[in-house]
């Protein structure tokens, strides 16, 4: 403890801060120059930003967008699509398993991810099956394309984006167009990730019971 704590505070803390600043700047520049492409790409890499603990570097971008334009095109939309792709992937893993105990546990992880909390699904079912993460990325890209082509906006800044935070995408005027984009992009992310992961599991993890 006498060694680890000072190293964490003095060395790793500043490095993490600098890395977060760089990631935030790169993502902001990417969205400014090519938002249609940026949404699917960033949705696909978002789980790894969460894993590294630097996903919060994107939150100031969302806050700035809300303050200046009244909506956010970056932080919550990419997290929403990514989280749903992770949820769909975990449900595919659960369907693939034969052991009822593990099946039920991982299915609950998938439902939790669909609600916006992905850590149980990511660490409890996906990360030990690296090829399945390809299916997760495919689902995120598919949903992200819709969210990029029909710019998905959120009007409330919050955490843990998922189906439970759909009202974050409701405009102040009550129009439903953006909500439809949120629903369609989210459902596409779940379904495509589920199908892609199911195919990968059948081909690569036949021994997984």
Role assignments for model-derived ranges:
Residues 51-52, 57-64, 87-94, 187-204:
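Transmembrane alpha-helical segments in integral membrane proteins
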Residues 62-140:
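Helix-loop-helix junctions within the multi-pass membrane cores of secondary transporters/permeases
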Residues 1-50:
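Core mid-bundle transmembrane helix pairs that form the ion/substrate translocation pathway
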Residues 8, 43-55, 66-71, 112-115, ...:
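Transmembrane alpha-helix interface/packing and boundary motifs in multi-pass membrane proteins
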Residues 27-41, 52, 69-76, 98, ...:
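Membrane-interfacial loop-to-helix junctions in multi-pass transporters
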Residues 36, 100, 108, 120-209:
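Transmembrane alpha-helical segments and their short flanking loops
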Residues 3, 7-12, 49, 88, ...:
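Alpha-helical membrane-inserting segments
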Residues 11, 15, 19, 23, ...:
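Membrane-interfacial segments
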């Amino acid at each position: 403890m006498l060694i680890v704590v000072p190293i964490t505070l003095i060395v790793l803390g500043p490095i993490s801060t600098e890395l977060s600043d760089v990631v935030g700047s790169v993502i902001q520049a990417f969205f400014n120059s090519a938002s249609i492409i940026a949404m699917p790409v960033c949705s696909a890499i978002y789980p790894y930003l969460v894993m590294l603990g630097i996903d919060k570097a994107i939150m100031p971008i969302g806050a700035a967008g809300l303050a200046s334009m009244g909506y956010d095109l970056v932080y919550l939309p990419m997290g929403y699509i990514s989280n749903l792709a992770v949820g769909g992937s975990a449900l595919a893993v659960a369907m693939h398993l034969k052991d009822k105990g593990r099946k039920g546990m991982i299915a609950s992880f998938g439902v939790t991810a669909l609600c916006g909390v992905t850590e149980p699904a990511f660490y409890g079912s996906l990360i030990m099956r690296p090829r399945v993460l390809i299916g997760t990325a495919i689902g995120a890209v598919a949903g992200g394309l819709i969210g990029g082509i029909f710019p998905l906006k959120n009007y409330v800044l919050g955490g843990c984006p998922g189906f439970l935070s759909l009202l974050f995408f409701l405009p102040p005027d009550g129009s439903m167009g953006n909500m439809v984009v949120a629903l369609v992009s989210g459902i596409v992310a779940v379904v495509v990730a589920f199908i892609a992961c199911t195919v990968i599991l059948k081909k690569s993890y036949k021994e997984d019971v």
